[in-house]
Amino acid sequence: MNTNYQYKFNHISLIMNNMKKFFLGLAAALMLTACNENRQPEATTSVDSSSVVTDLMMSRRSIRAYKDSAISRDTLNEILKCGIHAPNGQNLQSYEIRVIDSPALIDSITQAVVKDNPKIAERKGFKNIFVNAPCVVCIAYDTTYDMAQIDCGLLGENIILAAWAKGIGSCCLGSSARWILDSPSAKPYLDRMAFSKNYKLLYCIALGYPDESPEAKPRHQDMIKFMD
């Protein structure tokens, strides 16, 4: 490759990477500021915050390859605070959250599940049942409230977007929750989660620093229809 061309290519790549970091950082600031329960929205003229949030949503990807780096508890608390500020029916907050960021505990749960379902471990690159993430958020719902699962979904989306704004990837995992629920060997770990009476594990969210950059998958725009 021509030396001058290589220089220009590297310079452009550097600019693009810096722009990406800037917008993710800006999105993180906007997202986390929005999680302040005492703050009211304010008009802004310097930056179009709506486009930044839109870009954050559109750039999000499900991540299934993670670095081993741990997420600090302070960072996790900021992300989860955004989660619990999602809208929910009648403000019942009909969910409970358990966070597992101990590698030893994740390995123990994985071993228990695999003991009852060995085929899970046959997956390529398998390390744990949470797509090899170093952290997992387990979300349970109130089985006595018929809208609780909707509330859990809204909670999860806030968690996912707040994490992405901080450069942390995620993946929603219904299968992991099902494996835990269906595994007799994993019952001690489910009991250890100590969900309240009438609460049941619904799904998990894997969290970690991404070790991949997947392309967006097609979405079906024709699923949207306006009624006149």
Where are the regions that the model predicts?
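Short, Lys/Arg-enriched N-terminal segments with co-localized hydrophobic residues
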Residues: M1-N18
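Sec-dependent signal peptide recognition
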Residues: K20-G25
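Structured alpha-helical
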Residues: A29
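Acidic, surface-exposed loops and disordered segments
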Residues: C35-D228
